[in-house]
Regions:
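Acidic/polar loop patches that form or flank catalytic/metal-binding clefts of enzymes
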Residues: 5-8, 35, 71-78, 132-137
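Flexible, acidic loop-helix segments that line cofactor/substrate-binding pockets
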Residues: 74-83, 97-99, 103-106, 136-148, ...
Length: 194
């Protein structure tokens, strides 16, 4: 590994997808868990920062330390401060009362066998620790990407409109062609997507 941890921003998968392609762990914390202060925005309602690291434990340590720093600096912490290990908290939650939803086999039709095997291995581990595993229907997930695109494009255009008009030379043609798509998204479509 070139470095033990990297920090990225994730609006629609920019941490999670590259991580999964490279066999490392990418973690997108809950929205507003970590401050995005100093991050150049793309979508104010979806932008999140998070770690890319070798393991979930490494990601947990990163988030834990950032939360401690935010609390020490009196930044608003909507989750009352995470000062103990996220993984320890998760393990403590595993009980007969905890239910974990797992999609049906159809959901995994495009997933490589090795990835699928590791996923189900982790599910079996959680089951052995007391969690109840239930099958869930994630057909609605097919709408997630189009909804994300509407929100991201509308907010990105709104955020970048001033610079596109005043200093478009700082943008590549490819970026401009994506951003201007947001100009045609109606307020109704935007609010319906929220």
């Amino acid at each position: 590994f070139l470095c033990p941890i990297a920090v990225g921003s994730d609006t629609g998968g920019s941490i999670r997808m590259p991580s999964s392609f490279c066999g490392v762990t990418g973690f997108k914390p809950s929205f507003n868990k970590l401050s995005t202060s100093g991050v150049f925005p793309l979508s104010w309602s979806l932008d999140t920062i998070g770690p890319i690291a070798k393991t979930a434990k490494d990601c947990s340590i990163f988030v834990e330390e950032i939360c401690k720093h935010q609390i020490a600096n009196k930044n608003k912490d909507p989750f009352n401060g995470l000062t103990t290990s996220m993984l320890d908290n998760f393990v403590n939650l595993l009980s007969p009362n905890l239910k974990i939803g797992v999609p049906s086999d159809d959901f995994f039709s495009d997933v490589e066998e090795e990835v699928k095997k590791e996923f189900f291995k982790s599910i079996e581990l959680m089951k052995s620790m007391g969690a109840e595993i239930i099958e869930v229907d994630l057909a609605w997930l097919l709408m997630a990407r189009p909804v994300n695109v509407v929100i991201t494009l509308a907010e990105a255009f709104s955020l970048h409109k001033h610079w596109l008009e005043s200093d478009s030379k700082k943008y590549t043609f490819e970026v401009i062609s994506r951003l201007v798509l947001g100009e045609n998204i109606s307020l109704n479509d935007y609010f319906s997507s929220m």
